[in-house]
Amino acid sequence: WSPEQISGWLRRTKPRQKTLRISPETIYKTLYFRSREALHHLNIQHLQRSHSLRHGRRHTRKGERGTINIVNGTPIHERSRNIDNRRSLGHWEGDLVSGTKNSHIATLVDRKSRYTIILRLRGKDSVSVNQALTDKFLSLPSELRKSLTWDRGMELARHLEFTVSTGVKVYFCDPQSPWQRGTNENTNELIRQYFPKKTCLAQYTQHELDLVAAQLNNRPRKTLKFKTPKEIIERGVALTD
């Protein structure tokens, strides 16, 4: 958690306990100045990141994988306003995160709640990715299976099969436009704190990936008024039962 998340969560969950009121600046200064030599550099680096990176429209990832002409792909510009304004659960953004030795994981983030799912992949070919996504979405409640926004990578060439199997509509971003999946891009930056570049992702089990996702889903977010993604999504699903 960042100092801002700690401070905001305490204000929200302990409103009557004034002794627990503490500003982000106080937390940061205490950790940084009193324990600077004891703290590992990586921890300091994470403290400095009080929020995830915001990528501008000209930002592209180094080594961006090639795009293809997706057959019968629906462009992102045809998404409904309800998806764009984050009013309902079940609209996801997704992408692949790559490691060494040709290893990959798939990441999914719900646009409204910021709830994160991380999937182990056998490969980044369209068959492997389609199977992993299909299995996961079919395990979700129907109210969480509405749409998926992805980039134009060849791993989702079988998107029509995925939609037929799950009922989830797929929208494709414009080429070289990662900001159109900004929520997913920012979440991937958080995931990289657990799985740095030059890490072989194949060494991790699905259970280990689930534990990382659970940490992210139990982390309060300023954009959610310091509620957690898990709280938001569980409350939303409960209201539809």
Model feature map: region roles:
Residues 6, 27, 95, 108, ...:
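Mobile genetic element proteins and their domesticated derivatives, centered on retroelements
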Residues 98-101, 118-142:
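Active-site beta-loop-alpha junctions of metal-dependent nucleic acid enzymes
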Residues 102-103, 111-116:
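Coil-to-beta-strand transition motifs
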